């Protein structure tokens, strides 16, 4: 059996609940590691049709003494809905899972969101372990305890805050990740670079210029740093009453774009990439961000192989209406994360309709800034 290899461990402490984020190789097939967090006799593994053929058997093999049930869902954001959620509930109930059961999320952000929400609500809460298999889930979605399903009216409209027992990031799972999915995860890394600034921003710029791949030696520690950044923010503000809202940089635009296209045109990270560029242009329009930094953001997204412009087929008026459904609205004001410079971001609820519309026009494909 391949030997367990530890790169880093990030400790998270939220509201008295402590858990580790373990960045490693061969963690998925290490019985000591998995059973350290699965103390229950019953386990439900939630995964999807893409991941199951690759890793489900490996995970089941380290849980031979457990009642190990499995739910295999359709893959994709468009399936993060009530029907999929009730498929999880149905399996838990039909297989007589008790309150001391454990749910394992084996997959990307969609699986983590749904399995986590099921764990937070089944019998008022059961143990939950994240095994993220995409870069986006490893650096962002699996960290911080946000769980949700989508509603036809908007993304993540129904959800909860619920922390896992552990997050086990086995980097070997990235070897089978499609190139497009890997690049989508880089968008969240660029987001962290903009939030943190300083040497981290410069380092992300540098590795993107060189060409970041799944084989890049810098990748394990970059993932660990992203997890550390998010963990520190979430520890201070679990329920997004202030500081944590900064993690939504670019997401007001991104969620509206995803809803507009019924989650079928872009991966979440690709929509975030466009949202980051929109946020940079909006910050420039407000006189906050220097044009050279906007150009740097654009180059980072291009180096990452990510989209950054809004297709000219999108109805901008309808897009703005979808933004008005955003969960981040407070006192009827749409709130955007603005960038003064990398490492200096803040929440702004004074963006006018004209300023927002001018920003959207400027980021449409074929338009000049």
UniProtKB/Swiss-Prot annotation:
Cofactor: Co(2+); Zn(2+); NAD(+)
Entry's Gene Ontology molecular function annotations: 3-dehydroquinate synthase activity; metal ion binding; nucleotide binding
UniProt pathway annotation: Metabolic intermediate biosynthesis; chorismate biosynthesis; chorismate from D-erythrose 4-phosphate and phosphoenolpyruvate: step 2/7
Protein location: Cytoplasm
Primary residence: cytoplasm
Keyword match Kinase: no
Residues given in the record as NAD(+) binding sites: 75-80, 109-113, 133-134, 146, 155, 173-176
Coiled-coil ranges per UniProt: none
Record-linked SUPFAM superfamilies: Dehydroquinate synthase-like
EC assignment: 4.2.3.4
Metal-binding keyword on record: yes
Biological processes, Gene Ontology terms: amino acid biosynthetic process; aromatic amino acid family biosynthetic process; chorismate biosynthetic process
GO cellular component: cytoplasm
Residues that bind Zn(2+): 188, 251, 268
Cofactor note: Binds 1 divalent metal cation per subunit. Can use either Co(2+) or Zn(2+).
Catalytic activity: 7-phospho-2-dehydro-3-deoxy-D-arabino-heptonate = 3-dehydroquinate + phosphate
Keyword set, alphabetical order: Amino-acid biosynthesis, Aromatic amino acid biosynthesis, Cobalt, Cytoplasm, Lyase, Metal-binding, NAD, Nucleotide-binding, Zinc
PANTHER family to which the protein is assigned, alphabetical: 3-DEHYDROQUINATE SYNTHASE (PTHR43622), 3-DEHYDROQUINATE SYNTHASE, CHLOROPLASTIC (PTHR43622:SF7)
Family in the record: Belongs to the sugar phosphate cyclases superfamily. Dehydroquinate synthase family.
Function: Catalyzes the conversion of 3-deoxy-D-arabino-heptulosonate 7-phosphate (DAHP) to dehydroquinate (DHQ).
HAMAP family linked: DHQ_synthase
Designated name of the protein: 3-dehydroquinate synthase
Organism taxonomic ancestry: Bacteria, Pseudomonadati, Pseudomonadota, Gammaproteobacteria, Legionellales
Protein's gene: aroB
